[in-house]
Amino acid sequence: MAKVNLEQIEHAVRLILEAIGDDPNREGVLDTPKRVAKMYAEVFSGMHEDPKEHLHKVFGEDHEELVLVKDIPFYSMCEHHLVPFYGVAHVAYIPQGGKVTGLSKLARTVDTIARRPQLQERITSTVANSIMEVLEPHGVMVVVEAEHMCMTMRGVKKPGAKTVTTAVRGVLENDAAARSEILSFIKTN
């Protein structure tokens, strides 16, 4: 996949400024195309990374009980409106066969998946699927809570409304008690 084309983004931003009736040569917005291009390169940096790469570093650890990293902050851009949505991800898995990854690797996986034009539902399922594929755990549960600026600043204008999505894989799919336990851990401080 090609890297971000900064010049093309700068040109597009100038066109947007003109299209909304602003003067792209006005002092306040003169450097806006360059700033937006740099910002897009950063917020869409996940386009050029494979999230699974973060998970390949494993530790041979004889632990086959729940591992939960909760309240992982993330931001992403809604692919429908190219405005931000942000929130927290909670990632739980039950290791199998001594395949335990570093806790930061779970956070990096979330970040890489979120840093592209996205849907919250896709972030949730892609994190779960990536963990299942690379770590081959007994089970995975991912819960994502986010506020979408496309619902806050436009359209229905409902600031504070949060969307919650889940993805459950492996043994957790049929174990309501284990899912409830994970959700109770997520709720506690």
Curated annotation (Swiss-Prot):
Pathway: Cofactor biosynthesis; 7,8-dihydroneopterin triphosphate biosynthesis; 7,8-dihydroneopterin triphosphate from GTP: step 1/1. The keyword NADP does not apply. It comes from Bacillus mycoides (strain KBAB4). Zn(2+) binds at C78, H81, C150. One of its GO terms (cellular component) is cytoplasm. One of its GO terms (molecular function) is GTP binding. HAMAP family: FolE. This is GTP cyclohydrolase 1. Homomer. PROSITE patterns: GTP_CYCLOHYDROL_1_1, GTP_CYCLOHYDROL_1_2. Belongs to the GTP cyclohydrolase I family.
